[in-house]
Amino acid sequence: MPKANNAVASRARRKRILKKAKGFWGARGNVLTVVKHSVDKAEQYAYRDRRAKKRTFRSLWIMRINAAARLNGTTYSQLINGMAKNNIQIDRKALAEIAVKDAAAFSAIVQAANK
């Protein structure tokens, strides 16, 4: 009895893995055994960096808020403390956006926080 290959499924599996390696250089993009390792590692980096991105953006927002706060004569920590005491609930993402786009509104927030 002849060996059953199930070539359709095998080809689909290989094609799916090779498709994920599109744009990879050299053997990493066209040799299946190397591609498997490259794609696995790429997915590990992607998983890790989706989480790191959240930390990176939060630190970016804090830097922007701190820079704008110092232009208004206060510091980031004093501003956040003042906002908490005066029950001003604006998250860091929105606060950083206001600091960059609308300096007058940010100054008003700083004044309200320093009451």
Curated annotation (Swiss-Prot):
GO terms for molecular function: rRNA binding; structural constituent of ribosome. The keyword RNA-binding applies. Keywords: Ribonucleoprotein, Ribosomal protein, RNA-binding, rRNA-binding. InterPro entries: Ribosomal_bL20 (IPR005813), RIBOSOMAL_L20_CS (IPR049946), Ribosomal_protein_bL20_C (IPR035566). GO terms for biological process: ribosomal large subunit assembly; translation. It holds the Pfam family Ribosomal_L20. One of its GO terms (cellular component) is ribonucleoprotein complex. Binds directly to 23S ribosomal RNA and is necessary for the in vitro assembly process of the 50S ribosomal subunit. It is not involved in the protein synthesizing functions of that subunit. PANTHER family: 39S RIBOSOMAL PROTEIN L20. Belongs to the bacterial ribosomal protein bL20 family. This is Large ribosomal subunit protein bL20. It comes from Chlorobium chlorochromatii (strain CaD3). The lineage of its organism: Bacteria, Pseudomonadati, Chlorobiota, Chlorobiia, Chlorobiales. The gene is rplT.
